[in-house]
């Protein structure tokens, strides 16, 4: 076995999610992501189980490990109680740690996701925050969300929110003391270090592609090539 395999074995999710896979394919049959994406959790588990270093490295640099929605349907149906979703989490973790995520289109999307969501959490105390939500970036949310963003204050008031207000209520202003505690949690758990790692490798990739960070952000956020979905042309 190689170095990458050994690093994976240190992850508790591998210990809990990969026990005695018999390659029956039940996980792929039940997987919602496999219905749409070119994604086969059975093959992924088989690659990890074999421990081939080159194949594991290819996985870590691929789009494949980013298709999983982590719903864990696989765990509920596996006759041997394996959890391919847990294996995927371990692969994603190692890919981010080593910087391999920037080698795949879906992996590079870690940058805008981290920038937006963790930025919102640490600055406002919320994953999604009205001031940073742009309907133009999420047109799939439909006309209802378009109307909602155009009439934000009225909509929030009608729903009883306390937007940016003091005291209890939806979207209330989070005290700085609480935000400082969130930052400490990020620091202690390694989340801050992970954010810095993602930022560092993303900047290196942007430089390699000849893009500014804003250009890289927009590209990773908006671009989607063909070949990800089952009905795409090969």
Residue ranges and their predicted role:
Residues 1-16, 25, 188-199:
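Short N-terminal secondary-structure initiator segments
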Residues 1-12, 36-66, 84-171:
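Ferredoxin-type iron-sulfur electron-transfer modules in oxidoreductases and energy-metabolism complexes
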Residues 16-35, 62-82:
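Cysteine-centered iron-sulfur cluster-binding motifs in ferredoxin-type domains/subunits
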Residues 20, 26-28, 64, 76, ...:
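Residue-identity detector for threonine
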Residues 73-80, 117-128, 214-216:
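Short, charged low-complexity intrinsically disordered segments located at boundaries
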Residues 144-234:
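C-terminal, charged low-complexity interaction regions
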């Amino acid at each position: 076995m190689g170095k990458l395999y050994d690093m994976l074995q240190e992850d508790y999710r591998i210990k809990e999610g990969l026990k005695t896979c018999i390659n029956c394919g039940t996980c792929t049959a039940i997987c919602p992501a496999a219905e749409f994406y070119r994604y086969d959790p059975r093959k992924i588990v088989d690659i990890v189980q074999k421990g081939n270093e080159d194949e594991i490295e290819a996985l870590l640099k691929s789009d494949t490990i980013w298709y999983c929605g982590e719903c864990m349907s696989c765990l509920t149906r596996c006759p041997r109680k394996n959890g391919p979703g847990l294996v995927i989490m371990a692969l994603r973790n190692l890919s981010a740690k080593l910087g391999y995520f920037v080698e795949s289109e879906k992996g590079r999307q870690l940058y805008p996701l981290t920038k937006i969501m963790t930025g919102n959490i640490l600055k406002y105390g919320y994953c999604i925050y009205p001031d940073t939500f742009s309907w133009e970036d999420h047109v799939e949310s439909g006309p209802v969300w378009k109307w909602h963003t155009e009439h934000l204050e009225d909509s929030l008031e009608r729903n009883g929110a306390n937007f940016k207000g003091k005291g209890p209520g939806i979207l209330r202003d989070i005290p700085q003391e609480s935000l400082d505690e969130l930052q400490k949690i990020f620091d202690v758990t390694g989340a801050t270090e992970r954010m810095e790692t993602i930022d560092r490798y993303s900047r290196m990739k942007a430089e390699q592609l000849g893009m500014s960070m804003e250009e890289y952000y927009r590209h990773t956020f908006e671009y989607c090539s063909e070949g990800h979905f089952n009905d795409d042309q090969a």
